[in-house]
């Protein structure tokens, strides 16, 4: 497909949150998706999702059903700061800025999970982010001491609504006080690889340098990115890891 046709590619991406309730055992815990909340005891959280407004001058609540198109520019290139969050200036970058607020009365540790379709990662090439069809990222500020842990894979594969996903997680290492929001986002957005195209047979392809490879996923059907957050009481624990280990909350909320 020529460059002109690439410009009209548009895939609906529904960056949704799907609810899955975890066990609570004897500890106060809470879970939250973008639209659903389960509360147990004195811990309560809100998963906040935001995007830049049309003028790119302020953050506003995230809206579903974005058009996902190949990125123009680089997500690691020129950045801008909007409401304290560093974000890529690249065109066709889809903001999904995820923070968590402690809306309860007790200090709490929090963590977040993101599910990405397995078929949109790594293709037939070595396991490295540069070979993803669908990319996602967080800025370096979130890796500072006391902020978010490095991203880990907690499950692969997991089937959600008939689609195979790989589940990623990050944990906020500092306990959140009542009404406090994580100082940095866990994730800031998603983007389609700049080489994504459609061939003459209608197959979606990606090219990482060795010619187009067919993607084993029909992007015409859209992409769902489930997101899930968990919280556990901080009282009695010296670290987020210890608190979540004792809580009994599932490490894969969609299992």
Predicted regions and their residues:
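Hydrophobic membrane-insertion alpha-helices, especially the h-region
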Residues: 10-21
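Surface-exposed, hydrophilic segments of mature proteins
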Residues: 8, 27-255
């Amino acid at each position: 497909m020529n460059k002109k046709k690439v410009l009209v590619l548009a895939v609906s991406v529904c960056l949704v949150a799907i609810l899955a309730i975890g066990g609570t055992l004897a500890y106060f815990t809470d879970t939250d998706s973008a639209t659903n909340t389960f509360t147990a005891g004195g811990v309560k959280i809100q998963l906040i999702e935001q995007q830049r407004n049309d003028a790119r001058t302020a953050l506003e609540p995230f809206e579903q059903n974005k058009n996902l198109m190949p990125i123009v520019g680089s997500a690691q290139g020129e950045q801008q700061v909007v409401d304290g969050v560093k974000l890529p200036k690249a065109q066709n970058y889809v903001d999904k800025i995820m923070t968590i607020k402690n809306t309860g009365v007790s200090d709490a540790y929090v963590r977040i999970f993101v599910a990405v379709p397995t078929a949109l990662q790594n293709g037939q090439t070595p396991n490295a982010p540069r070979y993803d069809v669908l990319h996602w990222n967080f800025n370096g500020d979130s890796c500072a001491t006391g902020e978010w842990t490095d991203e880990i894979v907690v499950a692969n594969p997991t089937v959600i609504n008939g689609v195979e996903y790989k589940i990623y997680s990050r944990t906020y290492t500092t306990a959140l006080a009542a009404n406090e929001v994580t100082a940095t986002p866990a994730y800031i957005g998603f983007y389609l690889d700049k080489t994504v195209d459609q061939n003459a047979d209608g197959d979606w392809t990606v090219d990482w340098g060795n010619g187009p490879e067919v993607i084993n996923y029909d992007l015409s059907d859209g992409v769902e990115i489930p997101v899930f957050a968990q919280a556990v009481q901080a009282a009695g624990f010296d670290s987020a890891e210890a608190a979540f280990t004792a809580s009994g909350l599932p490490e894969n909320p969609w299992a």
